Every structure is written in structure tokens, then in C-alpha cells.
Amino acid sequence: MSQRQVLQVFEQYQKARTQFVQMVAELATRPQNIETLQNAGVMSLLRPLLLDVVPTIQQTAALALGRLANYNDDLAEAVVKGDILPQLVYSLAEQNRFYKKAAAFVLRAVGKHSPQLAQAIVDCGALDTLVICLEDFDPGVKEAAAWALGYIARHNTELSQAVVDAGAIPLLVLCIQEPEIALKRIAASALSDISKHSPELAQTVVDAGAIAHLAQMILNPDAKLKRQVLSALSQIAKHSVDLAEMVVEAEIFPVVLTCLKDKDEYVKKNACTLIREIAKHTPELSQLIVNAGGVAAVIDCIGSCKGNIRLPGIMMLGYVAAHSENLAMAVIISKGVPQLSICLSEEPEDHIKAAAAWALGQLGRHTPEHARAVAVTNTLPVLLSLYMSPESSEDLQLKSKKAIKNILQKCTYLPALEPFLYDAPPNILKHVVGQFSKVLPHDSKARRLFVTSGGLKKVQEIKAEPGSLLQEYINSINNCYPEEIVRYYSPGYSDTLLQRVDSYQPL
């Protein structure tokens, strides 16, 4: 047998290995093949190929493993149990850029599923190696490493802290300054994942100088980058007044308001979220947003989108309104009430309706003027029907009831109150009658209208416990009228008259 023939055996074996890993990597891109591959024992066949003498076979084997592990936690678990992680971590430090990208992809695919799987990656010493990859010359390697670190950090505080302790943050801040858009996106996303868990972790990101660099990218034309930048700033600002003020000091207003008009729905949503996370802390921060035109811009934004995209904007209006009557009035003047009423009526999902109900309650609870601004939009009957509907979620019923009470307790606009005399359940009716008892003694026109509209008659039909607050309110109303009028409208009065007719003896 000649040397050529002997070498041919090896060449054929190499070709077969190459063909096998390429086919598996290709098959792993389609969900319908995954179970068959798993049952055929693909994991144990790929493992030795990670240490193959041929670099392209190693890389393709890693790529195939990553695609498999990406699908579900069973396959990710198989990577951990198959003792593949230490091999990957070792190769991550030693191999070329193509292999590094593939290995980091496997680590990300395993770590994304659960805190336990992410912990397995930490336990095998991957963080230090991934952080070294953040300094790699190749932007693709940096991106793959940043992506894996972000996926590990997003699970919980402990894993995030482990990423910080490995020294990732200063390098991620350098990555957001690199020219490659994809790298900027992933690094900003990783900083967001780290910041979200606690004020301390967010502070670490701030101390590395991240805010200024993130703020500069708010106007970047790339929508996906803007999403991540706004998300990272939100995750920093949400924790405390100090952190929110640091974000504001980076001069994000009024520039961030342009994002509320963006074509990308998630840029809009994340911009609203950022404004909400700042507004919620203090009246001063809310006032700053009002002064920058932020309230009107958010209201326009809510009008231009639907569903969950609206939610942060709705909540932001509620937070601003909750701080003070002046801030609530700023929302009312900017036409916030009609927009929130539309959300309350239009949105199919209960949690969005509940947020709108809560925000309307915050707007109407300050003074009679505030309550009237909400009541004239015919919002109260909608809130009542949501509260009464058996189809409403528990949270929606609770928020609607609270909003009705908040508004009713300040409302002196009687045309909005009157329908409630007929439709409201006893626990709401008490507040309605209470408001009439406050207004009628001081308004003769309202007293007359209350009689002609049938309100007084309705009040006489209410059955109240003697000595109860409701009975006190009814007595206050009755005291506004001559006794014979009250008697005239009381149930059974016509029977009494007829009895008198029957018992009357003509002279």
C-alpha cells in the first residue's frame, strides 16, 4: 500500500468529520430537527470534535453545540453534564478569533436559560476568560464576549456581581465607545443587564463613566442601539433620586423627547420608560420634565401607539400627577385626561386598563377642579363598569374602585355624579351621596335640579342603616328641602295619600 493510499484514509476521515459537523450545524438551525438530533446522541459525538486537530472542525462543532444549547434548557444542561464547559473555557483563551466567537456563543446559549446554568458557567471559570476577550483586537470577539456576560448578569444580583468582580464594567464602557454599531448595542445591553438589579450595581456602572457615553448615543440613527441606550439609562435612573439626577445631569432633556416620535415602537417605549423612571422619584424631577415639554410629548406618544408600548407613558403620567396638584394640573392642561380615557376604553388588556385607571385616579384626587376635569370626559361610568364586570381581573377591579373613590371624594360636578345614584353598588353609593350632601346646602340651582331630575326621589329609596354615615348624608340632603317635599318623594307616599282619601269624611 503506497503512502498516497495511506494518507487518503486520513483525508477521507477528515472530510467525513468536516461534513458531519457542517451538516449538524446546518440541521440545528431548524427547530423540527432538534429532538431527532438529541435522540441520536449528537452531544456526545460533538464533544471530541471540539478538540479536533483541524481548527474549522473545532469551530463548527462549537457553533453546532451553541445552536443546540440555545433551543432549550435540556440541551444546555447536556452541555454542562457532558463536561464540555471546561474545554470551551480553555480553548477560549488559546484559540483563534473564529473559535473564540463560537465558544462565547455556546457559553451565552447555555447561560441564558436559568440562573443555575449561568452559575455553572461562572463555576468553571469562564468570566475571567470572557473579560479578557473584551480586550481582543477583533470586534466580533468583543461582541460575543459582551453578549455572554450580559446574558449571565441579567438573571440576578449575585451573577451580576460576579460579572462586575471579574472586571467587566470598565471594558464594557470602552466597548460602547468603539465604532462598530453591533458592539455598541451589545455592550449597552450588558450594562443595562448589570444595572437593573440594585443601586450598588448601577452605581458601579455610573462610576465607570457610562452615563455620559450612553447619553451621547440617544440621537444615534440606529434604532436597535437607541433601544439599548435608553434601557440602560432607565435601569440606572430607576433606583434612587441620586442616580436619576445623575442621568438628568447628562443633559438628556430635551433630546430624549425626540425618541418619543421615533419610527421604532421600542425606542418610543424605552424613552417613555426612562422618563417614567426619572419622574417617579420627586416633584422636582417631575417639574423638570414638565418644563422640558415632556408631559405633552408623552401624551402625544401614547396617542400614536397601542398596547404595551403605551404602558410606561400611562404610568409616567400617573407618577407626575401623584406628586402635587400643580403637576396634576400640568397633565390636565396638556390634554392628558382624554388620552388616558381612550386607553381605558380601547385597550383590550386588563393590565393596561388598570394602569390608565390608576393614573386617572391620581389626576382626579387633588381638588374639585381636578375631579371635574376627569369627570367631564365621561370616565366615571367606564371605571364603574370595569369595577362591576366579572370579566375584569382582580387588579383592574381594585384599581378602578380606588380611582372612582379618589375622584368622587373631590367631585362637586353634579351631572357626573347623578348617574351613580342609580348604578353604583352600596360601597360606592356612600361616596356619591356624601358629595351631594356637601354641595346641595350651598347651591339653590343644584337643589332645584336635584328634585326635577329625580335625584331626591332616588335618595329616599336608598335603604341605609340607622346611625350609619350613609344615613347621615341622606339626612343632610333632606335638611336642604321642606319636609312636605321630602315626604312627597318618599316611597309609599301615594299610598298614604290614598289612605287619607279613604278615611276622609266629607263635611
UniProtKB/Swiss-Prot annotation:
Protein name as annotated: Sperm-associated antigen 6
Superkingdom of the organism of origin: Eukaryota
GO cellular component, one term: microtubule
Tissue expression remark: Highly expressed in testis. Not detected in prostate, ovary, spleen, thymus, small intestine, colon and peripheral blood leukocytes.
Name of the gene encoding the protein in the UniProt record: Spag6
Function comment: Important for structural integrity of the central apparatus in the sperm tail and for flagellar motility.
One annotated GO biological process: non-motile cilium assembly
Organism: Mus musculus
KW Cytoplasm (keyword) present: yes
Keywords tagged on the record: Cell projection, Cilium, Cilium biogenesis/degradation, Cytoplasm, Cytoskeleton, Flagellum, Microtubule, Repeat
Disease tied to this entry: Defects in Spag6 are a cause of hydrocephalus and of male infertility.
Ranges of the ARM repeats in the UniProt entry: 31-70, 73-112, 115-154, 157-196, 199-238, 241-280, 325-365, 402-441
